[in-house]
Amino acid sequence: MSNKYCQALVELRNKPAHELKEVGDQWRTPDNIFWGINTLFGPFVLDLFTDGDNAKCAAYYTAEDNALAHDWSERLAELKGAAFGNPPYPW
């Protein structure tokens, strides 16, 4: 694993059950909100913060990829669109 956050995600996924408070930062953006924002600011073609299973775009960075460690400009130019970001946050 590349960092403690990614390791914690794997451990959480491997548990047979969990409490909602344990996955507070893993909720995905609701589809209606995503499509509304996409209509105003898109087209979104790159999801910056996903666990791989909750991606809103076909192209994405996972927590292990760490979108903040990359320059997205070339990838966005290739994909011809904008980046969508709803980062995980603890609650």
Swiss-Prot record:
Among Pfam families, the record links this protein to: Dam
Q: What are the entry keywords?
A: Methyltransferase, Transferase
The record's PROSITE patterns line, in alphabetical order, gives: N6_MTASE
**Where on the tree of life does the source sit, at the highest rank?**
Bacteria
What Gene Ontology terms for biological process does this UniProt record contain?
A: DNA restriction-modification system; methylation; viral process
- Known EC number(s)? 2.1.1.-
Span of the signal peptide? none
Q: Which GO terms describe its molecular function?
A: DNA binding; site-specific DNA-methyltransferase (adenine-specific) activity
What else the UniProt entry mentions is: Encoded by the CPS-53 (KpLE1) prophage.
User: Which named protein is this?
Assistant: Putative methyltransferase YfdM
- The source organism is Escherichia coli (strain K12)
Tell me the name of the encoding gene. yfdM
